[in-house]
Amino acid sequence: MAVGKNKGLSKGGKKGVKKKVVDPFTRKDWYDVKAPCMFATRQVGKTLVNRTQGTKIASEGLKHRVFEVSLADLQNDNDAERSFRKFRLIAEDVQGRNVLTNFHGMDLTTDKLRSMVKKWQSLIEASADVKTTDGYLLRVFCIGFTNKDQLSQRKTCYAQHTQVRSIRKKMVEIITRDISGSDLKEVVNKLLPDSIAKDIEKASQGIYPLHDVYIRKVKVLKKPRFELSKLLELHGDSGKGGSGEPGEAGSKVDKPEGYEPPVQEAV
């Protein structure tokens, strides 16, 4: 026989009595997730967090959350070229009921990557660590595939090792040139139409023609010190509102001349 105290009897509770079930959602609040001004759709979605209770502050629980959103949703566009690209946004500050986010990375969907890899062609990949003018260290990955010449009768379109090395060098040069001279906002604006990949495809035509050239992934390795003023500037007026609507401000009321406030009977 086991020796020990019966916790149920010591507390005076009856054995088999069910505990009162409390819905956990009654202790939570909804917050609006706001994307930076580079994107057409600013309202990304909503997120849940437990209400402020004791030392646990709700806004602290929201910070550093990462949201992954399709570019088609961010740009409010059904274009197939945008649907397979995902942008990662990280929550950096909370203003009222608005969660202000910043760019945290980019990636292609797995199904798109798998569909591009085929037989009888060479896959060329390159990556570079580049620092932006505002102090962000980014690791950028690029991918491309050799294209078959229309006049060629050959089944394959394999590039020679020297050609692959030349194209890879060209990829790193263009990525470094386009990102090192831009701040994070300009980099995101270049990633939206994928202009860097188009420049690489055009520059590689003299070495070996390519197709399906994309910036495959962007990772944020290091960030500068957080500044609220820069984040608010990135969001425009979306974070200025208090607990009410975004950007909502009070209006000034003109008082008549000689106006005196009424005397209150009780305080």
UniProtKB/Swiss-Prot annotation:
Localization in the cell: Cytoplasm
Any one GO molecular-function label of the UniProt entry: structural constituent of ribosome
One Pfam family here: Ribosomal_S3Ae
Keywords of this entry: Cytoplasm, Ribonucleoprotein, Ribosomal protein
UniProt xrefs under SMART domains: Ribosomal_S3Ae
Ribosomal protein is among the record's keywords: yes
Cellular component per GO, a single term: cytosolic small ribosomal subunit
UniProt KW Repressor keyword: no
Protein origin, superkingdom: Eukaryota
An annotated GO BP: translation
Signal peptide positions (record): none
Residues covered by region (Disordered): 234-267
InterPro entries in the record: Ribosomal_eS1, Ribosomal_eS1_CS, Ribosomal_eS1_euk
Subunit structure, as described in the record: Component of the small ribosomal subunit. Mature ribosomes consist of a small (40S) and a large (60S) subunit. The 40S subunit contains about 33 different proteins and 1 molecule of RNA (18S). The 60S subunit contains about 49 different proteins and 3 molecules of RNA (28S, 5.8S and 5S).
Family: Belongs to the eukaryotic ribosomal protein eS1 family.
Name of the molecule in the record: Small ribosomal subunit protein eS1
Species this chain originates from: Biphyllus lunatus (Beetle)
The organism's taxonomic lineage, starting at the top: Eukaryota, Metazoa, Ecdysozoa, Arthropoda, Hexapoda
